A protein has these predicted regions:
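Walker A/P-loop NTP-binding motif
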Residues: 35-47, 58-72, 85-88, 92-97, ...
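Conserved pre-motif I regulatory segment
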Residues: 2-50
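Long, low-complexity, intrinsically disordered polar/charged segments
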Residues: 1-9, 64-80, 84
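Short aromatic/basic micro-patch
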Residues: 32, 60, 129
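The conserved Walker
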Residues: 51-55
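Conserved nucleic-acid-binding Ia/Ib motif block in the N-terminal RecA-like helicase ATPase lobe
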Residues: 17-20, 24-27, 73-143, 148-151
Length: 155
């Protein structure tokens, strides 16, 4: 990182609750992908980013998503992942980032009873993370409504 880049999460103008959650997770400085992406996402720009595994890509989109979610209790962000394992991993990470906020995230994927997911979706979920097949199933059943989606992430 150069001296002109943001060096601490607090300097990225993040909510104190998010900075606190990141500190609890053991993170003090953003990775290069996070330092590059977070400000652009917070400014409302579309971002296409690529980085190696383990560089913090999930937090690069998860942090600004959590910061941008409003108190409205409807789905505001949709994150699509290719596998159920990644959906679970992303949901856990986003939930940790938003643990001090009132943001609710839910993974939806096949291989699990859909009824359980339908019930959970009624609990004011704001971020849904899922695999394409299960997301299509929910959309066709009208258990996921896309009316209020402000953010779409293809992971």
């Amino acid at each position: 990182m150069t001296n002109t880049q943001k060096e601490l999460f607090g300097e990225l103008l993040l909510d104190k609750k998010i900075v606190s959650a990141l500190t609890e997770m053991g993170f003090e400085e953003p990775s290069p992908i996070q330092a590059a992406a977070i400000p652009f996402v917070l400014e409302g720009h579309d971002v296409i980013a690529q980085a190696q595994t383990g560089t913090g890509k999930t937090a690069a989109f998860g942090i600004p998503l959590v910061q941008s979610i409003t108190d409205h209790r409807h789905i505001q962000a949709l994150i699509m992942t290719p596998t159920r394992e990644l959906a679970i991993q992303v949901a856990e990470e986003v939930s940790k980032i938003g643990r001090n906020s009132r943001v609710k995230a839910l993974p939806v994927y096949g291989g699990q009873p859909i009824e359980r997911q339908i019930k959970a979706l009624k609990n004011n979920v704001q971020i849904v993370i899922g695999t394409p097949g299960r997301l299509i199933d929910h959309i066709n059943r009208r258990t996921i409504k896309l009316d209020h989606i402000k953010f779409l992430v293809l992971d």
